Amino acid sequence: MATFLRPELSNFRAYSTPTSDSLPLELDYLDTNEFPWDLPTALKEVLAQQYVSTLASHRYPDSHHWPLRQAIARYVSEQSPTEISPHQIAVGNGSDELIRSILLATAIGGYGSILVAEPTFSIYGILAQTLGIPVHRATRDPDTFAVEIAAANTLIAQAAPPVRVLFMLQPNSPTGNPLTAAEVDWLRQLPEDILVVIDEAYFEFSGKTLVGDLAAHPNWLILRTFSKAFRLAAHRVGYAIGNAEVIAVLEKVRLPYNLPTFSQVAAQVVLDHRQALLAEIPTVLAQRDRLYKWLQSCPQLHVWPSVANFLFFRLREPQHTPSLWDALRDQGTLVRAIAGGIRVTIGTPAQMERFWQRLQASLNQQKSTDN
């Protein structure tokens, strides 16, 4: 490895997705928790008209995102007992950019470390490692996936450099479980020198939010995204909600002109039409509950309940998990192999039917091979 490159990156594992040349041409993508349907054609036509009539391609984007921040603040205020100001909103090129800004603002250069509870979204630890920030990994109960709070407190007490940021996904991914009352109480009792980041990427599916706690906890920050329920994964729009002082610092450390104009316009358009878009969420949840019952009926599997748009299950003979992933991929269904199990995104009814048929065929094939 070249001497000008940091040596700890030589064996570093980046966030990975399957390469397109290794996949079948016709594929059901049930691995990234995207919404099963694209934006309606009518909304795409609205966006196209915006591009033609108002978007100046030779101009840099609005670096302050002010109209979008105002629109987001109005939306979040609908879920908050107190009004949320645009000054409490930061917008990023996906939540990933906001996570990186948080790390730059809090823990880089030996100033601090972070705490995560695994299994969880891997990008928290990945981005911290790319910045040379130590990552402390708390454990979860193997049956419920609730954080083992006593062990987490021990990590916090012993951490050097000190824990500056705790990342908590609500509900958690890949497991789909919401925060328990005990976990929320624990977060509320953490010292104010720890930034508590609550990632609500799946809020629109779970209906669970802690935005009402922000006023009482200036060291809390909530992350959300337009990539899931709002169907803008291709546009990469995430946002943070928090104390205006913290938001101002995040604005200082991010790149200028970080979000393309078209992405800003798209986010405003879907917010303007949110009632129609979010009205389809019950259909997704019904598909999730149906698949959960199917998976429960399968003796080879252990499936966990979920309040998000995905389900997590493990094989009772976990050594077969890699071959199951391969078999599903070869039949045309891509899922996420993670945390010793499989996470499957809730897709269209047709995709769910195909997944179930392919899963049964794969499990039957494994059973016959074992015999």
From Swiss-Prot:
Reported cofactor(s): pyridoxal 5'-phosphate
Cross-referenced SUPFAM superfamilies: PLP-dependent transferases
Sorted UniProt keywords: Amino-acid biosynthesis, Aminotransferase, Histidine biosynthesis, Pyridoxal phosphate, Transferase
Keyword S-adenosyl-L-methionine found: no
Database matches in Pfam families: Aminotran_1_2
PANTHER family in the record: HISTIDINOL-PHOSPHATE AMINOTRANSFERASE, HISTIDINOL-PHOSPHATE AMINOTRANSFERASE 2
Protein known as: Histidinol-phosphate aminotransferase
Source organism of the structure: Thermosynechococcus vestitus (strain NIES-2133 / IAM M-273 / BP-1)
